[in-house]
């Protein structure tokens, strides 16, 4: 698992306890040489895949396509036994994260993403880092065969299919989903869909449910329309629109129902805490959940020069989000300062202290697993931070972790 260092301006980061909008502008995408566009050289070389492909930019990538091939996270590959390695603090991941793959790659150009279209200038799609780690490519049939041997005893509590912006994304998602559910029942390992709203319809949302998915998520990522446009839309020559993402999110609300849909949100790209927590409340009021990521500059992205989210900003939002999502605290009961930072969480000091000491609020958030509704199966080990300064804990925080979290929150004194 690769862990890239934050290349942001340390002085800027030290001076602020939040990332303001004006300081988080992405670079302008550069033009890709014609011969590198749409995976042309990968298709021209047409090297046949030989089983598992481990990303290596020093070799010509083989010609791999979904639905026959999918990529999976480094953590999932280690847990599945496909590649060696260990993860700090945890022996496995509880979510089998799958990613559709094509030589053409993702046709969107999101500023913070390692899979963005502009990266075709220097790196094949199969070799790009995503959420800070490599994603080996594996035949889907091999993955199903391994898990289907004994799904009830599998370490995985959930499987997730991540779509990308590609003309075949919907149809191939249906094929991969059916291949899985034909062999592995949802009671043993439920399935989530991380959707691509730009190319989807309401009928597509319905079909994922009909084929056995139990949870549907939309990666809003940006907390406001302006931030979305700057990082995911025309600001970076990308096709996504805030309105279309919300259209599919509301379709998921209708089709999947309360507790079975949600949205990804990245904290620290220029929104205020007030803005992101009002979005969290809006999702809860619809019956959904928020799945939060701490911004960490992805190597090779258009934002890899920018500072990671300061830990105090992240911890405030993490804690407030948990209270809204799982403890029935409303954002209207919270207080914010003139910069939109949380100053009061809307509950008493003793109750707040108990929530902090339990530690669950600071674990990775995502679709639920089999332990508790508020403990995510999708633990994404170190996907938004290095192990030396953990943002989202993929394991239960220990006593020393909670002491550090309290310092980051500015709440050092435990109330008895």
Model-derived features: where do they sit?
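Core AdoMet radical
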Residues: 117-146, 150-172, 186-204, 208-246, ...
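Short, electropositive alpha-helical surface patch
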Residues: 173-182, 214-217, 270-289, 344-359
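Flexible glycine/acidic-rich beta-alpha junction loops that bind and position SAM and/or redox cofactors
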Residues: 225-236, 268-271, 289-314, 327-353
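Conserved C-terminal portion of the radical SAM core fold
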Residues: 214-215, 220, 224, 242-302, ...
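N-terminal [4Fe-4S]-dependent radical SAM core
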Residues: 3-4, 24, 39-109, 114-135, ...
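C-terminal non-catalytic accessory extensions
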Residues: 384-416
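C-terminal accessory regions of radical SAM enzymes
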Residues: 312-396
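Surface-exposed amphipathic alpha-helices with a cationic face
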Residues: 177-186, 209, 249-257
């Amino acid at each position: 698992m690769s862990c890239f260092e934050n290349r942001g301006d340390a002085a800027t980061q030290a001076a602020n306890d939040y990332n303001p909008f004006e300081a988080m502008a992405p670079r302008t995408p550069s033009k890709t040489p014609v011969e590198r566009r749409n995976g042309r050289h990968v298709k021209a070389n047409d090297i046949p895949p030989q089983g598992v492909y481990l990303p290596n930019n020093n070799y010509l990538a083989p010609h791999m396509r979904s639905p026959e091939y999918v990529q999976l996270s480094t953590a999932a590959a280690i847990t599945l036994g496909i590649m060696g390695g260990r993860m700090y603090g945890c022996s496995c991941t509880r979510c089998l994260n799958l990613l559709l793959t094509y030589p053409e790659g993702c046709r969107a150009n999101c500023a913070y993403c390692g899979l963005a279209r502009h990266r075709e200038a220097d790196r094949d799609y199969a070799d790009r880092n995503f959420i800070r780690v490599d994603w080996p490519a594996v035949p889907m049939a091999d993955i199903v065969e391994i898990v289907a041997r004994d799904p009830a005893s599998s370490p995985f509590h959930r499987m997730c299919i991540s779509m990308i912006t590609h003309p075949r994304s919907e149809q191939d998602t249906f094929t991969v989903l059916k291949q899985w559910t034909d062999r592995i029942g949802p009671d043993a390992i439920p399935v989530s869909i991380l959707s691509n709203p730009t190319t989807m319809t309401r009928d597509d949302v319905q079909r994922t449910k009909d084929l056995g998915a139990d949870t549907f998520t939309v990666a809003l990522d940006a907390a406001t329309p302006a931030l979305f446009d700057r990082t995911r839309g025309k600001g970076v020559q990308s096709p996504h629109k805030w309105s279309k993402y919300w259209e599919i999110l509301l379709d998921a609300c209708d089709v999947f129902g309360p507790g079975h849909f949600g949205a990804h949100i990245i904290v620290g790209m220029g929104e205020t805490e007030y803005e992101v927590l009002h979005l969290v409340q809006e999702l809860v009021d619809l019956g959904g959940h928020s799945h939060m990521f701490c911004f960490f500059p992805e190597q090779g992205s258009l934002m890899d020069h920018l500072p990671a989210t300061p830990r105090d900003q992240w911890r405030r939002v993490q804690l407030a989000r948990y209270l809204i999502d799982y403890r029935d605290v409303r954002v209207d009961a919270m207080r914010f300062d003139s910069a939109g930072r949380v100053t009061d969480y809307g509950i008493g000091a003793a109750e707040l202290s108990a929530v902090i000491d339990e530690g669950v609020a600071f674990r990775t958030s995502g679709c639920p697993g089999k332990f508790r509704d508020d403990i995510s199966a999708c633990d994404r080990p170190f996907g938004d931070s290095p192990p030396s300064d953990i943002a989202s804990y993929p394991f239960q925080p220990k006593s020393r972790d909670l002491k550090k979290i309290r310092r980051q929150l500015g709440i050092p004194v435990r109330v008895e």
